[in-house]
């Protein structure tokens, strides 16, 4: 309950809450429906290991999940551009960030390899029977198979259930700070279908939800998008997170308790037992961003619903993203551009060995992971650090000198600017705030000259030696002997 002084006595406000805003469980017209049986399409997979393998071109890793089958651990794709990205596993569990994958998470991150919980879920609901399921294997797994395809800069989930053929494609544009989700739905049954598609995101807007829950508040943009802010995140001030869709009919809530209920949980959200979300936003809630839209499909009819989750530095930036990506053609154009970007980068160097498996890894996947996961995202399922490591990202930069020399050059100069005037360096630091640690790790000092020499040899760019950057200044580290003395 959110109480405001201007609305009068407590007794009046609680009556309003229990009257105007209360909504009853919906009574569904029928219970149960015969589900169409689908045969999983034949897949040409190389090196199939019982769970998945590469497609015939080696450009996608394809995972096949049938009833009762799970990968040994979460198998994920780290998808990013230079300022924004998300991690998604084969179950559909996902976390999204902007600018810093640890310090500025938009949604929750978890590295629990058993449960693999998600901060973002797309639910479906049959408006006739009330049955709910998720487009991805998590959190509501159905009996029919799932096909998951991790590609360069995108992931796709294919699934058929309840007469509906689903195809969900998730990606980030080449430069915009927004995650785009194309949900393609086709009615494969012989009857008209009315469905709800619901995007649920547990907001963080910081490092961990436990530390930001009391600071995040939600509101409605004049264009219908949901906005979330955290004015206490001083490292990323003024940022506005938004959730939007191309669909016109929409209902929403920013109250996680309303959506999940006291005993509902992700598998049985209480709000989905009711007709629609309550259109409640504001402060004082356990926050989330949840958006519901309703779709009607005739037999064999197909439609596309676009969900977008992103961040802008101003309301104008958010408005521009919403306007741009409510247009489905522009979304597909952005997808084509993202695929073309990775195709161009990854084909610049081709390696041919007698081992086909080695060729697949060397001609795409290793370089893709180095750039998307290591240099840009600096995150993974095991560890979500967000920081630049002085030696780590210099090592990574060596892998891209021949294909993206500008990125390697930028990385060298960035690390040069994190040297102290005494000659030691920041072992790691967070972009934005530049918070980090100062150490005496000696191997850090070796990597800057080593990588610079390699860069010059491979590019001929001796001008980099003429570049000037500033040193860091701070109180010098204490003498190591003085530091150790109390322990001797």
Model-derived regions: residue spans:
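Aromatic-rich carbohydrate-recognition surfaces in CAZymes
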Residues: 123, 300, 400-408, 412-488
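Anionic coordination/interaction segments
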Residues: 1-394, 406-414, 418, 454-459
């Amino acid at each position: 309950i959110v109480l405001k002084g201007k609305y009068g006595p407590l007794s009046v406000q609680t009556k309003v809450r229990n009257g105007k805003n209360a909504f009853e469980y919906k009574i569904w017209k029928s219970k149960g429906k015969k589900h169409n049986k689908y045969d999983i399409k034949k897949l040409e997979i190389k090196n199939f290991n019982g769970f998945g393998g590469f497609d015939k071109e080696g450009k996608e890793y394809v995972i096949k999940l049938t009833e009762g089958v799970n990968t040994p651990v979460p198998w994920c794709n780290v998808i990013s551009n230079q300022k924004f990205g998300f991690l998604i596993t084969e179950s559909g569990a996902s976390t999204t960030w902007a600018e810093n994958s640890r310090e500025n998470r938009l949604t929750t991150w978890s590295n629990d390899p058993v449960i693999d919980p998600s901060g973002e879920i797309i639910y479906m609901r049959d408006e006739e029977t009330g049955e709910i399921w998720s487009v991805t294997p998590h959190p509501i797994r159905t009996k029919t198979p799932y096909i998951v395809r991790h590609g360069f800069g995108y992931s796709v989930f294919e699934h058929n259930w309840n007469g509906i053929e689903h195809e969900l494609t998730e990606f980030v544009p080449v430069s915009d700070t927004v995650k785009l989700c194309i949900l393609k739905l086709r009615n494969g049954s012989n009857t008209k279908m009315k469905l709800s598609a619901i995007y649920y995101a547990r907001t963080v807007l910081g490092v961990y939800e436990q530390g930001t829950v009391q600071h995040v508040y939600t509101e409605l943009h004049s264009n219908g998008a949901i906005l979330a802010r955290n004015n206490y995140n001083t490292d990323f001030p003024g940022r506005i997170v938004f959730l939007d869709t191309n669909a016109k009919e929409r209902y929403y809530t920013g109250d996680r308790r309303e959506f999940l209920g006291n005993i509902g949980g992700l598998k049985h959200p209480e709000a989905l037992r009711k007709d629609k979300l309550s259109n409640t936003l504001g402060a004082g809630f356990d926050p989330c961003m949840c958006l519901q839209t309703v779709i009607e499909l005739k037999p064999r009819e197909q439609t596309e619903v676009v969900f977008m989750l992103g961040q802008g530095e101003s309301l104008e930036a958010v408005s521009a993203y919403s306007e741009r990506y409510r247009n489905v053609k522009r979304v597909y154009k952005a997808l084509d551009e993202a695929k073309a970007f990775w195709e161009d980068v990854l084909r610049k160097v081709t390696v041919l060995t007698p081992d086909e498996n080695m060729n697949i890894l060397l001609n795409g996947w290793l370089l893709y992971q180095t750039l998307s996961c290591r240099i840009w995202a600096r995150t993974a399922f095991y560890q979500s650090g967000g920081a630049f490591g002085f030696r780590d990202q210099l090592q990574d930069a060596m892998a891209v000198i021949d294909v993206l020399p500008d990125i390697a050059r930028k990385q060298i100069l960035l690390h040069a600017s994190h040297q102290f005037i005494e000659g030691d360096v920041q072992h790691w630091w967070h972009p934005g705030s530049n918070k980090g640690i100062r150490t005496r790790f000696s191997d850090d000092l070796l990597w800057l000259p080593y990588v610079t020499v390699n860069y010059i040899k491979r590019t001929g760019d001796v001008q980099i030696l003429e570049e000037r950057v500033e040193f860091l200044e701070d109180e010098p580290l204490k003498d190591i002997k003085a530091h150790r003395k109390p322990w001797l």
